[in-house]
Amino acid sequence: MHLKSIRLQNYRNYETLELDFSEQTNVLIGENAQGKTNLLESIYVLALAKSHRTTQDRELIGWEADAASIEGRIHKRTGESVQSLSFSPKGKKAKLNHLEQRRLSDYVGAFNVVLFAPEDLAIVKGSPQGRRRFLDMEIGQVSPVYLHELNQYLKTLKQRNALLKQLSTKGGDETLLEVLTDQLIELAVKIVMRRYHFIDQLEKWANPIHSGITRDLETLTIQYVSDTFQKERFSKEQMFETYRQKFDKIRENERRRGVTLFGPHRDDFELYVNNRNVQTFGSQGQQRTAALSLKLAEIELIHEEVGEYPLLLLDDVLSELDDHRQTHLLDTMGRKVQTILTTTNIDGIAHETIQQAKVFHVKQGEVETESV
């Protein structure tokens, strides 16, 4: 699949913008704070209905504007489609081929992207929250029902925490707590099982990619980390019973503290290079290679699941990679996927993928196209 064109209205520092993209490589060149990342972000938002930079949709609306919109034309094997998002103080609306979608989970997944930004290099050594977000967003692209299940889980978790807090201060009937606990467990089992499957598939692709980058000197494995389930795998029924036993065991502790003490909202995953935890023991180079391997594996995983390669977004990441890793990434781009990347300068990047790219110059929210 590829993004043929995009139209922005009052999106961040863009009042109006219409661009047509190459099916292969597109380069956005400009100094910092001119709008390159904003443009890349708008494509990510078009696909996933949320930003990777902020949780506040209001920040996406331009200065002194009341609303913002993004519209993209996407070409897939099955034909061409139009996707659009609009944002206002009242909320956001998502449309597929001009039909409004009642749930965002019905919208997400129709257009797939993989974003690689400098902060993704820190996913290996960063916080568990960042890794959970990575899991949630990527699983949501290949399994949109996951986002619905996750939203239901978080809603139930919020209700359960509020009730636990009430019980810890005022006491009361625990009948509702039992109902919410059962609902939470059912959703938790679905979420964890989908995460296990995703981790297995991601590792299947990431390991050979990592071996290729390191010239067969390193192997990469991924381990899902849960305080409920160790390395062993369980059936759906076994997982439900294990959760139930643990909730029963810590019931008084949760009531006393007024909060849910475990579940997929606290889980994590770990990366191992040659059986050593790369988060703890890996060099910066190993951590960056692991992050690059994850991103390249995402591309292959999405292709396997949906039958088409996603769009690759690179936000000023080439300058963060050494020549060897840079070449490996550019080789992947040139062979398989439409790519849109940002940079302040392409001088010194001799790779044919860049030399043959469609180039856009970005300055103060204005974009000019250059032929190469």
Swiss-Prot record:
One of its GO terms (biological process) is SOS response. ATP binds at residues 30-37. It is found in: Cytoplasm. The keyword Signal does not apply. One of its GO terms (molecular function) is single-stranded DNA binding. The RecF protein is involved in DNA metabolism; it is required for DNA replication and normal SOS inducibility. RecF binds preferentially to single-stranded, linear DNA. It also seems to bind ATP. This is DNA replication and repair protein RecF. It comes from Exiguobacterium sp. (strain ATCC BAA-1283 / AT1b). The lineage of its organism: Bacteria, Bacillati, Bacillota, Bacilli, Bacillales.
